[in-house]
Amino acid sequence: MIGKLKGIIDSYGEDYVILDVQGVGYQVHCASRTLQALPSPGEAATLSIETYVREDQIKLFGFRTDTEREWFRLLQTVQSVGAKVALAVLSTLPPHDLANAIALRDKAAVARTPGVGPKVAERIVTELKDKVPALSAVDPAVVKLSGAIDDNRAPRAVADAISALVNLGYGQPQAAAAVATASRTAGEDAETAQLIKLGLKELSK
């Protein structure tokens, strides 16, 4: 099995890159975020590889990091999620945001993925919630905030600040993570306006 490829970018397709490794061109399928982050043709690149072997084909999937590859594998343990859907999810949400979305039970964020409906998004969030800590470093403040929101214990200022950031166009996981950090910095008595200001500062980093 191929686990990693290091070579020169030859060309790009709609959902793949041709990587020239010592004269052999490998067609590697990638998430759109991965393709956008790769260099121009003629430049060097390294990809972690997941190899799929079928009776009629061998297909390679490429990732910038081993963590992204592990997410690709984990997503496919969910019913109705195959390689195509897993790549689509990773195109919509990078690993850190996906981890926060699952920690926050934010199925709406996952459902923004083209081809992923509410039922599949619900399964992803439900079935993977206990597996996230082993795979990604989820912000403890986000986990704590998730529990508070679930139990309706989140301070009104926190809930309002998250809502305001979402209304500004940020995703729920990003908004919640930013407000969690802002709340930790400003203290539990911080007002909505202060949390929004600090949250925006965090999101601009």
From Swiss-Prot:
Main location: cytoplasm
Region ranges (Domain III): 154-205
Coiled coil ranges: none
Region (Domain I), start-end ranges: 1-64
GO process annotations (BP): DNA recombination; DNA repair
GO CC annotations on file: cytoplasm; Holliday junction helicase complex; Holliday junction resolvase complex
Domain of life: Bacteria
Region of interest called Flexible linker, as start-end residue ranges on this chain: 144-154
Cellular localization per UniProt: Cytoplasm
One Pfam match: RuvA_N
Family designation: Belongs to the RuvA family.
Subunit note: Homotetramer. Forms an RuvA(8)-RuvB(12)-Holliday junction (HJ) complex. HJ DNA is sandwiched between 2 RuvA tetramers; dsDNA enters through RuvA and exits via RuvB. An RuvB hexamer assembles on each DNA strand where it exits the tetramer. Each RuvB hexamer is contacted by two RuvA subunits (via domain III) on 2 adjacent RuvB subunits; this complex drives branch migration. In the full resolvosome a probable DNA-RuvA(4)-RuvB(12)-RuvC(2) complex forms which resolves the HJ.
Record's comment describing the protein's domains: Has three domains with a flexible linker between the domains II and III and assumes an 'L' shape. Domain III is highly mobile and contacts RuvB.
Protein name per UniProt: Holliday junction branch migration complex subunit RuvA
Species the sequence originates in: Rhodopseudomonas palustris (strain ATCC BAA-98 / CGA009)
Name of the coding gene: ruvA
